[in-house]
C-alpha cells in the first residue's frame, strides 16, 4: 500500500493538495494511506521549507506548489513501475 503524506499547516493550499491526492487515488482505484502532517516540528525535520509538500512513500515529490490530480496520478503510476 502506498503512503501519501501532505505536509503543511492546514492552509487552503494544503487542503487543496490533500483533495487532489485523494481524487488521484480514487481515479486510479488504488489502496493508499493518506496522512496530513500539520506539526511544524515534523515538517521542518523532514526538510520542508515551503509548504505544502507532497511525500509519496517517504520521498518528497512536490514542495511549495499544488500538483494537479493528473500530475499526482502520474507520480503514483510511475511509482508502481
Report residues per predicted region.
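Conserved beta-strand segments that form the floor/walls of ligand-binding pockets within enzyme
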Residues: 5, 55, 61
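Non-catalytic, surface beta->alpha helical segment in thiol-disulfide oxidoreductase systems
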Residues: 58-81
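Generic recognition of short, well-ordered alpha-helical segments
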Residues: 16-19, 49, 67
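Structural micro-motif
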Residues: 47-55
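Thiol-based oxidoreductase modules, predominantly thioredoxin-like and allied folds used
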Residues: 30-42
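Local sequence-structure signature of Cys/Sec-based thiol-disulfide redox active-site neighborhoods
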Residues: 1-23
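Short helix-loop-beta junction
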Residues: 23-31
Amino acid at each position: 500500500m502506498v503512503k501519501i503524506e501532505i505536509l503543511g499547516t492546514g492552509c487552503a493550499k494544503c487542503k487543496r493538495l490533500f483533495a487532489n491526492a485523494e481524487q488521484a487515488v480514487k481515479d486510479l482505484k488504488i489502496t493508499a494511506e493518506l496522512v496530513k502532517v500539520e506539526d511544524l516540528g515534523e515538517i521542518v525535520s523532514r526538510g520542508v521549507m515551503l509548504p505544502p509538500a507532497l511525500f509519496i512513500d517517504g520521498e518528497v515529490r512536490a514542495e511549495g506548489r499544488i500538483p494537479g490530480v493528473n500530475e499526482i496520478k502520474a507520480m503514483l503510476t510511475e511509482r508502481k513501475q
